[in-house]
């Protein structure tokens, strides 16, 4: 599961991981793509309210009494299911991190964090309300967007602290330690991004 506030550069990190470490990427399609200049863009399925899938993913505890229906929703955009890991992307998982940890065992939760103001500014630079994919209507307007970015960062911090984990800088060393050695070059633009990978055990 990939979790990060808008503008946190979470999409770029998700693409870097899924394209270089043998992930299931059969959810990609021309309709599920947004490219903006040098911005890495959006690719593949995104979940959350007002989006194509997972309209109730901002209220997991109230919407999902069991694992099966949630799993079916997560699997639904993938043309082919296999043993390869899938990257399930949702900003609003921030509101249900404890539920994910307690109910979806044997998985990983990758949280991505960046300064709130920088996140908002980058989201606007990448297109803001003109971003064609995914749909950001749930965030309403600039004022609400800034509030939600703040809130999602705070909830991620609380979760990381409560599970006894720590944030780390997203760099080559962290990537190699957590996903295996690679020849990936991480752009300097990610130097202000922090990450935390949390395992949910059986």
Predicted regions mapped to residue ranges:
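PAPS-dependent sulfotransferase catalytic core
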Residues: 1-75, 188-202
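PAPS-dependent sulfotransferase catalytic domain
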Residues: 81-191
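Short amphipathic alpha-helix with an adjacent loop that forms part of the alpha/beta core around
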Residues: 71-79, 181-182
